[in-house]
Amino acid sequence: MSDRNKARVGEFLDRVLTGGDIEATGDYFAHDMVEEMPFPGQGPGLEGLKETLIRIRSGFPDSNWTVEEQVAEGDKVMTRFVWSGSHQGEFLGIPATHRPIRVWGMVIDRFAGEKIVSTRILMDTFGMMMQLGVIPPAGQQAR
């Protein structure tokens, strides 16, 4: 089951996050899934997740999510990933900068059967904000 769960996470990254098939999110997540560390403004359950993914996709329409490493134990899968793309639309209140990003992150997904029932994600948000020019690089003062 661990290998199957790892494959499901990889399929989700390819089909939904990189491919943009947001409607397919329900193929991978339970309707009442729980986001343990919700994205700012994220509503509950599957619908809240889909709304968040739409916002991410509109800010970064050329998003590419790559699995770097996965570890599975029991009903959990930990995935280390890289997210890249260019900031072409509003994201978290930040107007498009047209700058590229490359952000690392990790997510722990818990499965019940074929679907993810809880997830928690940690990304290098600080690094992303520096890449977008919102936070100045070390040694430079904010304007």
Locations of regions flagged by a protein language model:
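C-terminal and inter-domain tail/linker signature
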Residues: 1-143
